[in-house]
Amino acid sequence: MLKNDRWITEQAAAGMLDPFQKGLVRHLDPDQKQAPVLSFGCSSYGYDLRLSPQEFLIFKHVPGTVMNPKRFNPGNLEPTELHHDEDGDYFILPAHSYGLGVALEKMKVPANITVICLGKSTYARLGIIVNTTPAEASWEGHLTLEFSNSSGADCRIYANEGICQLPVSYTHLTLPTKNEV
């Protein structure tokens, strides 16, 4: 079942999203249509999360290395610099590479709700794929977000601006999970 902005706002007041931006922000100065941003905040049937400026990690290329998901080596990740110009704060995700970031908003998912996080079309048009990420019933924390740059060019990934859509749909569960915290 899709949940609307009223429901999302009520749940945010109960701690589901923090910080919470009521309404979708498209410009930092909406009266003058100045300082456009990648939209974030509450929309009619979802919420656009922002990327935290605290840390962004990219996989470094290590010739001869084969990645093993059963023996993940965090040494293959390296932090990247947060840049700033008139367009805002951003990280650079190199062409054909993969990065990890974290959502600015902390989530506290209700016990009878599961949320799916999807990428924004604004980034998809540039070849940036945001991995579909679930936040299961009763989960609490900052979502780790995975990014793949499938294009042949380096790409900016903006911090403090919309990075993914949450939720496109809520799955209203018939019973709370037995793993409820």
List the predicted regions and their residue ranges.
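DUTPase catalytic domain/fold
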Residues: 1-173
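Single conserved hydrophobic/aromatic residue that forms the stacking wall/gate
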Residues: 172-181
